[in-house]
Amino acid sequence: MNESKDGSRKYDAANPRGLAEFMKTGWAPTPLEGIVPSEAIPFVKVRIEKLSKKYPGKRVIIPAGGLKTRSSDTDYRFRAHSAFSYFTGITAGDAVPDSVFILEPNTNGHEALLFIHPRSSRKTTEFYRDAKYGEFWVGRRMTLEETERKYGLAVRQVEDLEKFLSNE
């Protein structure tokens, strides 16, 4: 891929240190006010229970999918896989590319876990340099806590997914 660690592309202009430091300061907190739990939560719980009973003792992994390139550095609007939306209740506007829903086996059936790419931090340059996830490029994403409140699922960062899957 043509992206660096901070999400910038090889043809993006250099990021002077002064600009990077300036862009990290002075941002007001912008929590989402009045998050209402999704009306889909009761339906999702039933769907998860049925899926859990179908695969006892097995780990179930349902990816949301990724972005599809339209032309060069332009992507089509993201649409999560239908199975991901069905089992999480996450609607189009809240779906984040590369998210993964997992049913992890436990003594009670399964634990439902959602791995997402959370809102960009102001401690890095990602929020204004990363064309794939940066808030200036694609808009505000929900934090882990906001997603958990709205959809009633345990939420973790997608960056932790590989480590989670390797700890069988």
Regions found by a protein language model. Give the residues of each.
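A composition/biophysics-driven feature that prefers long, compositionally simple stretches
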Residues: 1-168
